[in-house]
Amino acid sequence: MPLLCADIGNSHTVLGLVSGGSVLADWRVATDERNTADDWSVLLRGLLGAALEEIDGIAVCATVPAVLHEWREMLTRHFPAVRHVVVEPGVRTGVPVLMDNPREVGTDRIINALAAVHEYGGPAIVVDFGGTATTFDVVSAQGQYVGGSISPGIELSLESLGRRGAQLRKVELLRPRSVIAKNTVEALQSGMVFGVAAQVEGIVDRMIGELGVGATDVQVIATGYLAPVVLDECRCFTHHAPWLTLRGLELVFERNA
């Protein structure tokens, strides 16, 4: 029986039916802080239909406290008989967090670290391309979360340009014909696609240098729904794992349920 995994991010919520490391079905919906527990229940029943009655359990991680509160309420009221794990401090992940304040680290980042080491080994660097933020997370060869970096996400950057630039408008995230653009739309696309690619390669290169290992000794994994936008422009990635967080949620569920 599959597990329902929910990765609740600032911009979007990714839902997936996961079994044995494979994603059988998936959905991506906007994260709306106005949604109540009842709203989320209606949404889940509409998306999953009869499949919701066949799930083995529910695993949840969230970066939005208000939404997580409603999910807890939903699980208690609408799915009281379904086993569930909400990833938070105190939940066993098996990942030592070597940070000044481990509780500050987003649960999705710890889950990605767990899945990365489980699937590919360490040391590893996970680059998660979200709409609000692009995160870089470093895992040691021993499976320890040793730190990372956070930069503005691609969608957030584009929206900020649109709000602040009077003559700029929102554009589709596509690879332009060349870096040297001939119109405003392609100039914005060039800055986003090639700019983010250069940023990613630069940060990854610096991280590998600080780890003190050879570039070929590090697994560099791209994940997140915006990864395909820049994937072909980055030479640093060894793996593209679009469902890394869902796989990590499955692993955490197995350790705690």
UniProtKB/Swiss-Prot annotation:
The keyword Transmembrane appears for this protein: no
Enzyme active site: D108
The protein's name in its UniProt record: Type III pantothenate kinase
GO BP, sorted A to Z: coenzyme A biosynthetic process
Gene name of this polypeptide: coaX
Assembly information from the UniProt record: Homodimer.
Swiss-Prot/TrEMBL catalytic activity: (R)-pantothenate + ATP = (R)-4'-phosphopantothenate + ADP + H(+)
Keyword Repressor: no
Lineage, broadest ranks: Bacteria, Bacillati, Actinomycetota, Actinomycetes, Propionibacteriales
Binding, substrate: G106, T107, D108, R109, T184
InterPro entries reported for this sequence: ATPase_NBD (IPR043129), Type_III_PanK (IPR004619)
EC number(s) on file: 2.7.1.33
